[in-house]
Amino acid sequence: MKTSKYQQIIDFLKKAIQQGQFETGQKIPSVRQLASQFSCSKDTVQRALLDLTYQHFLYAKPQSGYYVLEQEPNRHEDLPLKLDKDRNQAFEDFRTCINETLIGRENYLFNNFSDQAGLLEVRQSIQGLLKEEGIYTPSDQIVLTAGTQQALNILSQIDFPNKKSQILIEQPTYHRMNQLLDSQQLAYRTIQRNLTGIDLEELEEIFKSGHIKFFYTIPRFHYPLGHSYSTKQKEAILQLADQYDVYLVEDDYLGDLDGSNAPSFHYLDQKDRVIYIKSFSTNLFSALRITSMILPQALLKPVLTYKTILDYDSNLIMQKALSLYIDNGMYLTNKKRLLARKKEEEARLKTLTTQSPLLPHLTLTHDGILLELSQVQSLAALKHSGLPLDFFEAAYITSCPYQLAKIKSADAANVLPKLTPFFERETLV
C-alpha cells in the first residue's frame, strides 16, 4: 500500500532526528519548505508536525517554527487517539490560559475561597459549552469536583431521595468505579453490557427489586467496549428508571468524540433524575483534574455538604484557566482537532481490518480494535505471547470472562499480523 504524504513526512523527520541529522534544539525545515519537498499541502505538513510534537520529537515556538526536542532512549511510542500527553497542542494552549489567569489576579486566586460548587465564572463557561452540545442546565446546578473519581465517590456515599442503597453497574465498566465499590464495601449489583447494549428485561427485573439507588452507565463510547446506546435504548432505560424510581449517573467522558450529536440521557430526562458527568482531563491532558456534574435540585445540598468534608474547592487557578480556555474558543478548536484525528484513525483501522484474515473476529471502536476470543486455540498462549493486548481484567469487579481483548489504535498495524497463528484456521478469511 502506498505510504501517504503525511506518513512520509513523519518517517523522514523521525529518521533524521534519530540519526542525528537534526540535533537537539535545531530548527527543522519550515512548513513551506516541507510542503514543497513532499509536494503536498501545508495542512498535511502541519498535521505531521503536530503528531511529532505529541510523540515528543519536536516542540513549537510561536512565530518561529518547530525545533528538535531533547531525546531520551526508548521513550517514543506511536500516539494513541486519546491525546493524554502533556506536550501537545491542548497543553500549550492551556498553559497560555494559565499565564493569562495569573496576570493581575494573584491576590484573588491565592487568597480567595470560592463557592463549594466551583467558581461561578467557570460554571457559566461550562454551561455555555454544554448548551452547544445540546445539554441544557442553569449554572447553579453545576458542581465541580477534583476529577471523576471524586464525583463518583461523593455520589456513592450520600443518601438519595429514593432512600435506596444499592448501586447498579455495567460489566465491564470503568475500572475505578469497580475499585471504589470494592474498597468501600458498597452494596452493588451488575448487569452485562455487550457490543449491542444491555438486556432491558433483566434491567427491569433489577430495578423492580426496589433496592437500586442509581445506575452508573457510560452511554457513549463505553469503556472499554466502545459501544454507544441508541436513542431508542436510552429512552427505554429512562422509562424504566422513572417507573421504578432509580437515578441514572451518566458518565459522558468521551462525549466530545460523538460527531453525530446523539442526545444524552440528560437531554432526554423529563423527571430530573439524571446526574450528568463530564470530565475535562480525558480530552485535554490527564493532569487537569476538573470534572463537572449536573445535579438534580434534590441532590445539590447533600453533594455540596459531603464535598466540604473532602475539600473546599478545586484548584482556583486551573478553574479560571479552564474558563478562559472555553471562552476564547480553544476548547472547541481542540474538539474539532480530536474529531478530525478520530476520523483519520477510523479510516486507517478500517483498512487494516478489512485486509486482515481475522476480519470475522474484529470490531472497530473509537480507540482501537476489539478481538473476539471464542475461536482462539489457546487463551493462555495468547495471554503470555507478549503482544500488547488489553484483556479487560480490571474492567470486571469479579472474575474476567476473557471474551474480548482490545488492540490499541497505535499497535494495530504491528499486532494484527501476529495474531493469526492463535486462531483456528477454518475461522479465518
Locations of the language-model features?
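PLP-dependent aminotransferase class I/II
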Residues: 276-355
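Short Gly/Ser/Thr- and Asp/Glu-enriched loop/turn motifs at secondary-structure junctions
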Residues: 63, 138-139, 362-369
